[in-house]
C-alpha cells in the first residue's frame, strides 16, 4: 500500500474509528486501471474478452443475468480454492461483478451508492449523453450463503441446478431480503431521476 500511495495509485481518506489511516482510489482514471488489470488477469485470452464483451452488452440492453452469472462461475470464481471460498462474502461477489461490468463510456458506475442513508451494492446509471441508446440502468444487491447453511457439500452443489437452488428455504429468504431492499432503493432513485431512469433491479445470491 505504501508504494501504491507514493506512486499516486492510492490517496488518503481520513482515519477509521481506531485512528488508523484509510486509503482509497483517488479518481476514476486510476479506478479504471485497476479494473482493467484485474480483468486481464481473470480473462487473459482474446477469446475470453470477446465472450465477456458480448455477454455484458446483452446485460446492459436486456438485464439478462443468466449468461453473466455463468461467465463469472466459469472464470473469476474458478481461481478460488475451497479455503478461499470459506472467507468469501458480498464484497468478493460485488468486486467480480464490478470488474466484469465496468464501462465508463456507457455508465456512471457507483459502488455502494448512498440512497437516503441506506446503501445499495452496485449502481450502473446510464450517462446522460448515452440515454438515446438501448441501454438500461441497473441496480444490483448481493447476498452470500455458506454451503453449511444450505446443507450441501461441494459435490452435491455442483450437481444441483440453479433453478433447484432457488427453491431452498435459505435461498428464498435471502432473495426476498434483497428484493425488499431493491424495491426501497428503486423508489429513492425514481424520485431523484424521474422518467429518465429505465431501471432494472437484480437480486444476486451467491453460495
Language model feature labels by segment:
Residues 169-207:
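Nucleic-acid nuclease catalytic cores
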Residues 1-178:
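Extended alpha-helical interface modules used as scaffolds for assembling large macromolecular complexes
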Amino acid at each position: 500500500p505504501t508504494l501504491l500511495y507514493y506512486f499516486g495509485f492510492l490517496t488518503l481518506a481520513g482515519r477509521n474509528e481506531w485512528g488508523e489511516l484509510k486509503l482509497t482510489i483517488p479518481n476514476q482514471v486510476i479506478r479504471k486501471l485497476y479494473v482493467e488489470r484485474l480483468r486481464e488477469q481473470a480473462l487473459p485470452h482474446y477469446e475470453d474478452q470477446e465472450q465477456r464483451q458480448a455477454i455484458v452488452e446483452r446485460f446492459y440492453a436486456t438485464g439478462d443475468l443468466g449468461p453473466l452469472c455463468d461467465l463469472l462461475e466459469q472464470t473469476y470464481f474458478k481461481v478460488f480454492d475451497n479455503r478461499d471460498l470459506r472467507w468469501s462474502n458480498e464484497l468478493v461477489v460485488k468486486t467480480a461483478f464490478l470488474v466484469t461490468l465496468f464501462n465508463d463510456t456507457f455508465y456512471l458506475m457507483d459502488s455502494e451508492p448512498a440512497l437516503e442513508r441506506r446503501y445499495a451494492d452496485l449502481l450502473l446509471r446510464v450517462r446522460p449523453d448515452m440515454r438515446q441508446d438501448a441501454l438500461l440502468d441497473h441496480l444490483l444487491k448481493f447476498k452470500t450463503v455458506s454451503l453449511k447453511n444450505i446443507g450441501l457439500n461441494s459435490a452435491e452443489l455442483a450437481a444441483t441446478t440453479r433453478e433447484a437452488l432457488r427453491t431452498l428455504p435459505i435461498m428464498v429468504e435471502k432473495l426476498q431480503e434483497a428484493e425488499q431492499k431493491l424495491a426501497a432503493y428503486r423508489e429513492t432513485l425514481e424520485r431523484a431521476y424521474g422518467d429518465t431512469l429505465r431501471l432494472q433491479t437484480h437480486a444476486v445470491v451467491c453460495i
